[in-house]
UniProtKB/Swiss-Prot annotation:
Coiled coil: none annotated. One of its GO terms (cellular component) is ribonucleoprotein complex. One of its GO terms (molecular function) is translation elongation factor activity. SUPFAM superfamilies: EF-G C-terminal domain-like, P-loop containing nucleoside triphosphate hydrolases, Ribosomal protein S5 domain 2-like, Translation proteins. GTP binds at residues 28-35, 94-98, 148-151. InterPro entries: EFG_II, EFG_III/V, EFG_V-like, EFTu-like_2, G_TR_CS, P-loop_NTPase, Ribosomal_Su5_D2-typ_SF, Ribsml_uS5_D2-typ_fold_subgr. The gene is fusA. Keywords: Cytoplasm, Elongation factor, GTP-binding, Nucleotide-binding, Protein biosynthesis. The modification Diphthamide is found at residue 596. It is found in: Cytoplasm. Pfam families: EFG_C (PF00679), EFG_III (PF14492), EFG_IV (PF03764), GTP_EFTU (PF00009), GTP_EFTU_D2 (PF03144). Catalyzes the GTP-dependent ribosomal translocation step during translation elongation. During this step, the ribosome changes from the pre-translocational (PRE) to the post-translocational (POST) state as the newly formed A-site-bound peptidyl-tRNA and P-site-bound deacylated tRNA move to the P and E sites, respectively. Catalyzes the coordinated movement of the two tRNA molecules, the mRNA and conformational changes in the ribosome. It comes from Methanosarcina mazei (strain ATCC BAA-159 / DSM 3647 / Goe1 / Go1 / JCM 11833 / OCM 88) (Methanosarcina frisia). This is Elongation factor 2. Belongs to the TRAFAC class translation factor GTPase superfamily. Classic translation factor GTPase family. EF-G/EF-2 subfamily.
Length: 730
């Protein structure tokens, strides 16, 4: 206990010196060794015993993680490392590598300033490596590289010393190619990873050794020595001469920025307020005595303390008892406890200053992405943009009717803890629907509801989430209010895909200055008049007001947008969410008396015009796709390609490496259920495969009617398809 107390004292002292802080994440493709690396870094810093490191999986503290052998949540820990005789505080987040839990990676990247990208020396960069690197660069998080499992190259693939260096060079080149393509400016500004400069380390997390060019100079151990030690199976000597934690954490401290440096570049990317305001300056310079600006990146539940909000403190200091505002709510809350994480344990401290990652209780209105501040009306941080979208849904029911009220509360809670999960109540069927990133994601959540929340549930078979869209433009359609006193003339048309992409990337929002948004839309090819009239953005859909001088329209526009949003949440064809639609209001006639243009009149009028318009514009469906990457011995390649093509898959690329074939394909999510078992049979169990989100595409016309019919039947809608006249005659 003495050692632990001493560690806490060192951590709390260093917290107050931002130059000595490094906030870092460890990111990688699944099974490339992130959690084993994290544990050995903790052992090196004296947090857990060296004997248990790598086998204890301290960071995988959840039962589900240990049972499945994968990281599901992002875990936080603070530790101390000595570099050049100076102590440094390292706040470390270990993130999941499985594509279904990518939301945790995205959120963790908002909290950190640097990332250790882990790549398996044998497998090289994989789809999820690319995804996590993109997430890091998008949040302006600087990467360094750790090439793991070098011992496997030598002992399993039997490569010689020269071939080993060539292969390692290829991994570095590929990572740099990704950085250059994703962020050319940062690449030019010195963010490329370079072994000679010291921003790359090589080693084995399992056997606790690592080498880098600075480490070679320090220890005199060369690449040839590494090769000989591995060949002889003498990992112990290698770990004594070149300890993993020393090589990796020295690299982190030397090359990844402290909060003072990082926030100068990052604040303008993640916050669009006035940089010259007091809070703007305070965030840019990480002032501990400025106004509080804290961004919540994670919500978890402590059985004793209730909800714990973890996040990054950009400005000010957090102390127990202080009163704060949470974005999206007008009332204040009182901070109850402030603390830091040491793996699964949360340790209370008196005060946490800017530049740190903090855990807070008492913020009952906070959700992931909330801005917590002492300023009333502060511009909130930009929302966290997730790379993937929920593509699979299950219906959830309580096994025992008496548990229904508890289930509703539990679903609200899990949605708060995991914002990549979407919970909706299907009002027609009374079912609770849970949409997630994939089958595994939903399985884990369902298991947690039963295990942690003590509610027995039954779930339906997984169902694919579709999107409604349109194929052509319509003339303006008249929507009348039930009392016939108000009329709206709205046309609908497909929204340009470049604009859709910019909305998804967060480059076009309703929060940004109007002139900036207008300019961006004009650059992307939108007509100047339309770009001027943006009234609302909902998911990847836009509502434009092109009217001139209509009396009372300003007072009713909010209700018009409510009607627009209702349709965008559930389209007329299948009640699925709508994507990539532009609605343009070209004219309106409104009753002069406000009593005749209330919500019950205006919302149905705008809603019906859009619903009818979509049906006239060839309403269709988009289905989600996954990119599938399969590694298989060349002799068994035929079985793998046949399996993919039999699922409506398109082979995008095929390459060979040694006796392995690497197949890249794009397959509809609807066809991927049961793939794991089938691909094993087709390849005698020798295929390794992974997936990533592959966007949405139009459902082929040959199966559209069948799929629409299945969705309508499942939702209890009429068998006959709706017609535009059904909405216009209302």
């Amino acid at each position: 206990m003495g050692r632990r107390k001493k560690m806490v004292e060192r951590v709390t002292t260093l917290m107050n010196d931002p130059q000595r802080i490094r906030n870092i994440g460890i990111v990688a493709h699944i099974d490339h060794g992130k959690t084993t690396l994290s544990d050995n870094l903790l052992a090196g810093a004296g947090m857990i015993s060296k004997e248990l490191a790598g086998r204890q999986l301290f960071m995988d503290s959840d039962e589900e993680e240990q049972a499945r052998g994968i990281t599901i949540d992002a875990s936080n820990v603070s530790m101390v490392h000595t570099f050049d005789n100076e102590d440094y505080l390292i706040n470390l987040i270990d993130t999941p590598g499985h594509v279904d839990f990518g939301g945790d990676v995205t959120r963790a990247m908002r909290a950190v300033d640097g990332a250790v990208v882990v790549v398996d020396a044998v497998e090289g960069t994989m789809p999820q490596t690319e995804t996590v690197l993109r997430q890091a660069l998008r949040e302006h998080v600087r990467p360094v590289l750790f090439v793991n499992k070098v011992d496997r190259l030598i002992n399993e693939l039997q490569v010689d010393s020269q071939e080993m260096q060539v292969r390692l060079g290829k991994v570095i080149d590929h990572v740099n190619k990704l950085i250059k393509n994703m962020n050319p400016e940062k690449f030019k500004a010195g963010w490329k990873v370079d072994a000679a400069a010291g921003t790359v380390a090589f080693g084995s997390a399992l056997y606790n050794w690592a080498i880098s060019v600075p480490m070679m100079k320090k220890t005199g151990v060369s690449f040839n020595d590494v090769y000989e030690y591995c060949k002889a199976g003498d990992m112990k000597t290698l770990a004594e001469k070149c300890p993993l934690h020393e090589a990796v954490l020295d690299m982190v401290i030397h090359f990844l920025p402290n909060p003072l440096v990082a926030q100068q570049g990052r604040v303008k990317v993640i916050w669009h307020g006035d940089e010259n305001s007091e809070v703007g300056k305070s965030m840019t310079h990480a002032h501990a005595d400025g106004d509080l600006a804290f961004m919540v990146t994670d919500i978890s539940v402590d059985p004793h303390a209730g909800e714990v909000a973890t996040g990054r403190l950009f400005s000010g200091s957090l102390t127990r008892g202080m009163e704060v505002y949470t974005s999206g709510t007008a009332k204040k809350s009182r901070v109850q406890q402030v603390g830091i994480f040491m793996g699964p344990e949360r340790l209370e401290v008196d005060k946490i200053p800017a530049g740190n990652i903090a855990a807070v209780t008492g913020l009952k209105d906070a959700i992931v992405g909330s801005t917590v501040t002492t300023l009333d009306g502060m511009t909130p941080f930009e929302s966290i943009r997730h790379v993937s979208e929920p593509v699979v849904t299950v219906a959830v029911e309580a096994k025992h009717t008496k548990d229904l009220p508890k289930l509703i509360e539990v679903l609200r809670q899990v949605a708060k803890e995991d914002p990549t999960l979407q919970i909706t109540l299907d009002e027609e069927t009374g079912e609770h629907l849970m949409a997630g990133m994939g089958e595994l994601h939903l399985e884990v959540i369902a298991h947690r509801i039963e295990r942690d929340k003590n509610v027995e549930i039954t779930t339906s078979k997984p169902i694919v989430v579709y999107r409604e869209t349109i194929k052509k433009k319509t003339e303006p359609i008249e929507g009348k209010s039930p009392n016939r006193h108000n009329r709206f003339y709205i046309s609908v048309e497909p929204l340009d895909l470049e604009i859709v992409s910019a909305i998804k990337e967060g480059e076009i929002t309703m929060n940004m200055p109007e002139l900036e948004r207008r300019q961006k839309l004009i650059e992307l090819g939108m007509d100047k008049e339309q770009a001027k009239g943006i009234a609302g953005i909902f998911n990847s859909n836009i509502f434009i007001d092109q009217t001139k001088g209509i009396q009372y329209l300003n007072e009713t526009m909010e209700l018009v947008l409510d009607g627009f949003e209702e349709v965008m949440r559930a389209g007329p064809l299948t009640r699925e969410p709508v994507a990539n639609v532009k609605c343009v209001l070209v004219d309106a006639k409104l009753h002069e008396d406000a009593i005749h243009r209330g919500p019950a009149q205006i919302i149905p009028a705008s809603r019906q015009a859009i619903q009818a318009g979509m049906l006239m514009a060839e309403d269709s469906l988009l289905e989600p796709y996954q990119k599938v990457f399969v590694q298989v011995p060349q002799l068994l390649m035929g079985g793998a390609t046949k399996e993919l093509q039999g699922r409506r898959g398109v082979i995008l690329n095929m390459t060979t490496e040694g006796d392995l074939a690497i197949i890249e394909a794009r397959v509809p999510v609807a066809e991927m259920f049961g793939f794991a078992g089938e691909i094993r049979s087709a390849t005698e169990g020798r295929a390794m495969w992974s997936t990533e989100f592959g966007g949405f595409d139009v459902v082929p016309s040959s199966i559209l009617t069948e799929i629409v019919g299945q969705i309508r039947e499942r939702k209890g809608l009429k068998k006959d398809l709706p017609k535009a006249s059904d909405y216009l005659s209302m």
